[in-house]
Amino acid sequence: MLRWFEEGGNNSDVVISSRVRLARNINGYNFSYKMSDTDAKKLVKNVTDQLKTISPISGYNSYNFDYLDAYQKMGMRERHVISPYLEKQDYAAGFVAPDEDVSIMINEEDHIRIQAFAAGMNMQKAYTLADKMDDVIGDVLDYSYDQKFGYLTTLPSNAGTGMRASYMLHLPALAGNDKISGLIPEVGRFGLVLKAMEGDNNKALGDIYQLTNLVTLGKSEKDIIDNLDNIAEQIIAQERNYRKQYITKRKMTALDMVYRSYGVLKYARKVTLNDGELLLSQIRFGLASGLIKADGFDESNIYQLMIGIHPANLLMISNKDMNEEELEVSRADFIREHLPTIH
């Protein structure tokens, strides 16, 4: 079965994924940050026991932090199956769909976080997946809900719908033209946040950024998605425009950049994470812009590589501890093994 990020999607030249995350708490428990270890264990066990027998969750893969090592947790976080916050929790559990498009986290910043992904720009699909799962879970758990304030959440900014919607965007042209710092305050005027998925906002790792809503209280799910879509479409148009300008004015330079990136990755024997992500970003740009072609391989496959070269994945493949140099050698081997032939 293909995982969600192995599929193509709308506007996939710029939009890697659509994600909806719902924050929910359960009556009878303190918020997660106030819970004792005893109560945290009780929450994890009780919720897990209640959810594991119901459809469709009974067909999901389950996990419990009692039985995972640090590398396994890190690998799940690298694939966005769990959040950085959950990774640091001592007591946590959850369920993941076989294709990893739906994930249920227990004892995150809120008692339950439901997240759903769709490839490319398809927020409605992600929302439908999350909403259906929310209904299933809400049938067996007593959510904390107030008629005036909506779903009660640990952070007041999440109250109301409890929904955060976000797009993961590949923005090499905007980043390369130093336009990200100007976009951040602009999207902020519309209640949105634009930030690097990893690294510095001015130069994100792999040129990958997240656009997400900041305000949920007083907004319907449709309001949130419509506002996000409107701004995302403007950013997509700007990114495409800068790509077109670059290729029109400096096509040989663009081709040279893409082929150099390919050549380095094809023959390098050591690759750092930063270099690997940068060079793969440039190849993704080349594929998405039509500068190069690879049979049976497109920009979505490049994103698989961008996930695959993170440390935990390499450590799990090797099944042994590695120092930094050994990781760089393993990363170069992994890239050479999966890099397609281009023309």
Where are these regions (language model features)?
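Long, Pro/Ser/Thr-rich low-complexity/intrinsically disordered regulatory tracts in eukaryotic proteins
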Residues: 1-148, 163, 175-177, 182-184, ...
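Conserved phosphate/anionic-ligand binding catalytic regions in large, soluble enzymes, centered on
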Residues: 150-168
